[in-house]
Amino acid sequence: MSDNIVVGIDIAKLKFDVAVWSGKNHYKTKHFSNDLQGFDAFTDWLKPDSNCHFCMEATGTYGYPLALYLSDKGWIISVVNPVQIHAFGKAESLRHKTDKIDAKLIARYCASHHPPVWQPAPHCECQLLALVRHLNKLKEMLLTEENRLSVADEIVCDSHTKIITLLKQEINDTEQKIKKHIDDFPMLKKNKALLESIPGIGERLSTTLLAYIGDGSRFHHSGQVVAYAGLNPKLHESGQLKGRAHLSKQGSAELRKALYMPALAAINCNKVVKKQWEQLTARYKGDRAIASKIH
């Protein structure tokens, strides 16, 4: 078989659709269950086409097990920002959207753009990310319950109070698990200490950065980290329309949220950062776009 065979994968919670494309308008399509049995059936089905380049969208927990499975088997796999696939689809003026059509679109994107090969993060970093995400969800649930309690009828207040107590205990337990997990792995412990040596970065932010960025080796310059968080300014101008710069928000919303308040704190506490902020204020409007540059 030729080297230009690509496989587009459209991931859903319970299944995934695939499209094997070898050029022109010829596709081989099929769908499989999104579990280990489906992964094995998928690779068995592909055996005649064993030199493929796989491509899927970065869909978080739904797609990660399959991406890891393919990587462990030695296949070439790329994991692409969904925004890039969406823009590619708009350029093709697609009229319909189905899982099969999306898989074909991803295959064509892979063939034309040759995205970089995806490398899985170390298992200890994946576990840390899972813990940090779980902690964030628990905190969101706690805030929701506290808001409900503030307006609840007296007859259900006791139930809300019990749930709040349980959530606080789970939050505390998860925070302790995170600390122990970092202490158990010298690499994580060392990188966390390096992050906290930077003025303005405390334990909470260092843990979040460690979970989402790792040791930073997959980023070649700071601009890539900013883009990964979706904090890069995006300017829209057309003809005589002079648009304002806005955050692209084409990245990790969780990381963006974690960085925003420390950036504002740095503006108030760090003279160098404050001077940079004042210079940017004279050039741009919009505190969020300016704060992104402070990072």
Regions found by a protein language model. Give the residues of each.
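Short, well-ordered alpha-helical microsegments
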Residues: 62-67
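Gly/Thr-rich phosphate-binding beta-strand-loop-beta motif of the actin/hexokinase/Hsp70
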Residues: 2-21, 106
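Anion (oxyanion) recognition and catalysis
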Residues: 71
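Nucleic-acid-processing active sites and adjacent nucleic-acid-binding tracks
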Residues: 21, 25-53
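Long, charge-rich intrinsically disordered scaffolds of nucleic-acid metabolism proteins
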Residues: 75-194, 198
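Short, glycine/acidic-enriched loop or turn micro-motifs at the edges of active sites
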Residues: 13, 60, 84
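Phosphate-backbone recognition surface of nucleic-acid-processing proteins
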Residues: 203, 208-291
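Acidic beta-strand-to-loop metal/phosphate-binding motif
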Residues: 51-59, 106, 263
